[in-house]
Amino acid sequence: MHLYNEWLPPPVAEETKKEKESFARVVRCVKELHRPDDPESVYATLKWISVIELFVRAKSELSVEDVSELVEIGLQIFHSSENKLYAQVRWGNVLVRLINKFRKKLSLKVQWRPLYDTLIHAHFSRSPGPEGWRLRQRHFMAVTSLIRSCRRFFPQGAASEIWSEFMSLLENPWHNSSFEGSGFVRLFLPTNPENQDFFSEKWIKNVLELWDSIPNCQFWNSQWTSVLARVIKNCSFIDWESYLPMLFSRFLNMFEVPVANGSGSYPFSVDVPRNTRFLFSNRTTTPSKSIAQSIVYFLKPGSSAHEQLEKLVNLLEQYYHPSNGGRWTYSLERFLLHLVIAFQKRLQREQQDPDSLPATCLGKPERVAFVGVVLKLIDRGQYSKNEHLSETVAAATSMLSYVEPSLVLPFVASRFHLALETTTATHQLKTAMMSVAFAGRSILQSSMSTAKSQDLGGDVDDRMFLDLIGISLSNALLGMDANDPPKTLATMQLIGSIFSNMAVLDDSSDDLSFMTMASFSEWLDEFLCRLIALLQHLEPNSVINEGLSSSATSGTFLVEDGPYYYCMLEILLGRLSGSLYNQALKKISKFVQTNILPGAIAEVGLLCCACVHSTPEEAVAQIVEPMLLAVISSLKEIPVNGYGGKGSAETLVSNKQDKQTLSPALEAAIDYQLKVLSVAITYGGSSLLPYKGLLIEAISSAFNSSSWKVNGAGDHLLRSLLGSLILYYPIDQYKCLSRHPAAPALEEWISTKASSKDEQVAHSRWHVPTQEETQFANELLDLHLQSALDDLLSICQSNIHSDAGDEKTHLKVTLLRIDSTLQGVLSCLPDFRPSPRHDMVEDLQFFIAGASGSCVGSAEIREKTAITIHAACKYLLEKKSDDSILLILIIRIMDALGNYGSLEYDEWSNHRQAWKLESAAIVEPPANFITEFNSKGKRRPRWALIDKAYMHNTWRSSQSSYHLFRTDGNFSPPEPLTFLVDDLLTLCLHNYETVRVLAGKSLIKLLKRWPQLLSKCVLSLTENLRKPDVQEYVVLGSCAILSSHSVLKHLTTDPKSFSSFLLGILSSSHHESMKSQKAIIELFVKYNIHFAGLSRNILRSLESHVEGSTSGDLVSQIGSMSFDSSSLHWRYNLMANRVLLLLVMSSRIDPSFSLKILDETAGHFLKNLKSQLPQTRILAISALNILLKESPHKMQGKDQPSVSSQETENANSSLDLALSQIFREEGFFKETFESLSHIHITDTDSSSRGNHGSSSFQSMADKSITRFYFEFSASWPRTPSWISLLGSDIFYPSFARIFKRLAQECGVPVLLALKSPLEEFCNAKERPKQCVAAEALAGVLHSDVNGLFNEWDSWIMVQLQNVILGQSVESIPEWAACIRYAVTGKGKQGTKIPVMRQQILDCIVAPLPPTATTTVVAKRYAFLSAALIELSPPKMPVTEVKLHIVLLDELICNMSHSSAQIREAIGVILSVLCSNIRLRMSYQQEYPTEEGKTDVDSQLKEENWFKLISAKASEAVKNIQQASISDSLDTSTDVDMGNAQSNGDSLDDVKWMETLFHFIISSFKSGRASYLLDVIAGFLYPVMSLQETSHKDLSILAKAAFELLKWRVFPESHLQKVIGVILSSADDSNWRIRSSTLTYLRTFMYRHTFILTHEDKQKIWKTVEKLLVDSQVEVREHAAAVLAGLMKGGDEDFAADFRDRSYAEANSIQKRRNRRKSSSTQSIAGVHGAVLGLVASVLSVPYDMPSWLPEHVTLLARFAGEPTPIKSTVTKAVAEFRRTHADTWNIQKDSFTEDQLEILADTSSSSSYFA
């Protein structure tokens, strides 16, 4: 049994034993309801889902057989309800919960294919259903999480099936299907034991290759990282050693951090289509979790993973420092957190699985090493300004301190002392407090544990840690400050968490020796003084608001900002020993009696409450009794109304003569005392019985008072008293019952997953009401509920008040008393008894146990109250309908009456958010290496678990009877309840908004619980929308209720409500006011978003008009509304069209639906294309896209069997006829084109494509009506758009698709009808018109219908040629998009070739006439690039390959074209051509085909283009450089002819180079560079050397290419080539080139640090060192900066060697200087180089103080007297050193000697830092 259920109050715990039985009954019911032959039976099973969830959430003990049976049925139901997304969502979610909870006990086999089919059918197919996008989103989430849960049950061989299924999607990395493929692989690939044999070396190589094919794309990275992380974790047999350098290199480069002043994010990340990002987990940040998990599972004894991790941490640690925050902080913070969590989980797994191999387990040395590395990150991030990071650091410290206390605790201690010493940064103290609080338990355990399993090194350390706690507690006293909330809360958390560890707080015990400075009682005194001072100085948050809403506890930050205050008090007072408790109680009692603090009601109340909770008898005597007496004596002196229930009507009248008022001060005082009392007695229980008379008197006199404020306080007191008497709540919660076996001074903490040997966990004690208490409660009910009800009736029936004001007051007080008692007894007053149908008396079902207290009163009382309230409500609505306070009171009473259990539910949900119970301060991890004491789960203090059990009980009591009537149709709602519903229906249409909202909430809750009442409500509310003269507020109220989920769900199954709802909305256009229109539209949009299809019985009722029923004419009614001609407002016309579409789409699923309606609606929407209303046109486009299907006129491919002719004619003739009649009308298409061109808005700024671009004139609501989710899943283009020279187009693929479908539907007639309008519009002047023509042409060309060839030859080809040769420029983007659409490959992977592709390509490639202008040339190139992107390289037919070869030759000849625009186009096309060829070649090598060995392939293999370009490049660079040198020399005027000649050449070279740079840039931008790396590596030198030339454009391009190069990681195969280029250009004669080589080196080394070999690194170090003594100053300084970076980056041996050498060198120079004062013979460069070597060493450790640093800095400072370049270098470096070490200077200066400090002080201008 789960611990929480074991610890429930005894009466409830007894009941829970029946739950196993009742679950079995539920499973049987579901089984009976589900009939596999009838798919509609799914709807009947849905009502049981919430009941099944109940059992899961109640943590009941269920039998595994039942669960597995239910899961099997559930999966069947899930697969059989194919088109019912809503049912799949509900079943999917409940299955996920069941499978995850029982995953270790179930033995299922789940097939993956049906799940995949569901996913494809609902989200990746071209013809989706009508469901709203919110529902689709939920469906996607449900299906994917179901797949994740079922992965572990996939049978053997599933992995290889899945892999081969999705491999085909990954063939072409430049097609969007590859993103989908990676998403599917991540989602489906199982790593369960059955499938582990699939993961081989070959598979890993394959994955790494695939991963490399798309660079710089976080989506892609996160998919593959996640797959690998799972494999690494679960398949421990794979040896990863050889892949580590490569993987770590990947990991490092996935963190987008700024390297060497670069930017912190990818310059061009590859664009992932929106829907893929939306569907597959779309975190575009670094996949930190998977990286961390992989690294932790790499660690093994003897593996090199640890060194790699250390290197990674060395490179990343600087970005954790507070001064280096940025966008990357989030992913780094996650990385740290997941490293620690994964490490902890792995340790726990190894602890609990004793037979795991020692070879793979983490031993002591591995643990120490790991903790040591992570501490570096913790050290950097501890005082981060980023909230999350500093909290994560504290939590990580806490977890690691249980693993390796000897490393972590000294660190915590030193950090705490450091924070105490700094006076400037106060936020540090808060963080330091937090880390001590979080590590408190491990500090105490390691110092007090008697089993000293590992020695911390003598007593000194033990004392040190205990002192640390002592110091932190004494500092905590200073931390309580009313002006600094964060610090105050941190100190309270600290005190609470440390005392949670102690068994008892007492002076006499020796164990608490950490209170060195004073005895504990002194500390306690001081603490209470501070606390009282704090309470006296609190400022209340707001003016205490009058009226009902001011609860007793609207507190200040102590109560509002977290539970620490109350928690700390409870723990402290619960753990004190008897004598100390009395000492504290005296002090508190004195404080409470002498102070009145209306600003701190809640705080003082909680203080008293904690005292009472700890030992009720004494506290009640010392605190409650004096306060009660004081209040009663004050209450006697104030004026009364006497409506409070005591005394008869005569005395009332006599009291009334003098109306004196109450002084505000006295009123506030009484209010304060009553409210504090009400909080204080919350846990009083039976110890309140002696004061029964006093309490009754206090409450009655409070209600009798004439002040409303005092009445309200009386209400609090009554509520609290009732609760304290009859509810179940834990007592002794904070006492310590079991001590820790290893350290008796500490409390033992408990895990909820108790193993068998800890069974004797002490139960919690509950307050179970005694007979006297229930008797007292019943008396209170008589006094304040029964008598108040009689009063209420008498006021409403016999007018007893002549004065309206008196009547109002009396009503207010009477209602308040009723409300107060109902709120107090919660669900202890029995619920209404439902009336069974058919006179059968049957017992109520039982689902789960739960009660919040023992029963008082009877169901009759509830019924009587309801009937009285019904009468009162009627009276109020007649007489006092404008009095909102009375109405609100009455609604609250109705809520408490009707929604049985909802008050408990509210309390539970508020509490759930309030407690930060997961805080690391009170969690002890399962694997604890301090006490060598491991448990199955996390351990927590007993009080925290009791708190959870208490909340669990509250939740159970709210749910125990909630679902009884939802599943059982045998009961009809009791009569009083129907009264309440009628009243609430009237109230929720009230003209005051507050009243409407409250009544609405209450009504919706009631309807949820009694679904039988729904249809009545829906009918009456939709009637309100239809009536002509209804007030605005009635419309608003109706819409609010109608848009609730229960109503929307009800509409899918109930035909009558459905038709009344739709007609109600559509015929509500007569409401004038803006507000009501807005409400109606919002309701309609919400209906659309959540639309869940229609059930069969609604569709039947729609069709049944044949038999002459009424609702059948719904379709025709709506149809008549949706024509332009009807005089409706355009938005209603739009809504009618939308409803028509939804009906037709829903009905397509039903096979018996008549096709006639389908044809009619398709025709209707086709006509709407030329409608006058723009919105309706847009909707028509969506509709046609959905209704038109592919059809008989499409050409038959080779593989499809041809259909016999007469079949085709019958198959679709009806739709064909219906449509062709319409478009054969004269001028139909011309009009349509006209009206469509108006939708195209050429707004330059919006580059949003595909979303109808109609952003400018569509509001959000209209968008949701006109658009379908569908637009977003089958989106075009299917390849990434990265070519910027195409510009942004306004080409809408959905328009093109209509024309394509029309052509496929009706064949050649469409082509003929389109001919003349197309010819007219292609030559139009306006861009929108050309755009429509482009869309129509694209659709026709892509349609593949029979007879297209003839039309192509007769007129289409001519049209296309005209477009190419046309002079107009502005519509190029649209025509490029048209061509791109027309050649797009078909099928999911875009590999099926459209029939017309070859013809279109030939038409574009055909050479232009020699007279063509540059615009035409540029246009042709733009079209070419658009078309080439769409080709699918792996499977190109030979004709397309030949085309590539021809084009390559043409372009290489044109590379130095005179126009810049054309040069760019050539560069872009070259990158596409070359990468396409490369990809095809690599594909042919892997999967060679027989006919593939043609002459074409051998031509490709030679790669002539590569040789040509490379040769030309090196030559061009030389020429450009010489030219620029001769330019600078050539100042003479007489230029001879030869020179001019060479100048012209060099200009050609410049143009040629520009094209080459365009080629490089576009390869990077498009992500195609992976296939061209060897080519690009060859062009590294030109890019580096042409950064600074006299040709401005060239240099700009070179710089752009350079920025992109910095981000590229080269694989090992090309590294040698790159290093060769780097080394040679570092020796270049031009110093600018040397400098840019250094710039490149910094990032190059960072990106490749894991994969460079030792020799390569040595060469690079040597080269950089040589540049330290370069002749040019800039280069020298640059080299020093690079060296500092290299030294940070991990290669310790190189760094140490260099440091020693540079120190020796500088030292010898300094000594020589000292020997002879004269200037030395050494060159300035030499000395400067030596100094810079020192500078590099000093700057390489910006925040630490290693042992060698002081000497280096001092030596550096001695050079301050040198001549100019050296002097400034020294001063800058010392200043920088001082800046970065300023934070911790107080401690770090101890590592310097006095002399060294003096020398430093001389160099520094301001010596104040170095005091």
From Swiss-Prot:
Gene3D superfamilies: Leucine-rich Repeat Variant (1.25.10.10). Induction: Upon MG132 treatment. GO terms for molecular function: lysine-acetylated histone binding; peptidase activator activity; proteasome binding. PANTHER family: PROTEASOME ACTIVATOR COMPLEX SUBUNIT 4 (PTHR32170:SF3). This is Proteasome activator subunit 4. The bromodomain-like (BRDL) region specifically recognizes and binds acetylated histones. It comes from the Eukaryota. Keywords: DNA damage, DNA repair, Proteasome, Repeat. Belongs to the BLM10 family. Disruption phenotype: No visible phenotype. HEAT repeats lie at residues 563-599, 1156-1193, 1442-1479, 1613-1650, 1655-1692, 1746-1783. One of its GO terms (cellular component) is proteasome complex. Associated component of the proteasome that specifically recognizes acetylated histones and promotes ATP- and ubiquitin-independent degradation of core histones during DNA damage response. Recognizes and binds acetylated histones via its bromodomain-like (BRDL) region and activates the proteasome by opening the gated channel for substrate entry. Binds to the core proteasome via its C-terminus, which occupies the same binding sites as the proteasomal ATPases, opening the closed structure of the proteasome via an active gating mechanism. Signal peptide: none annotated.
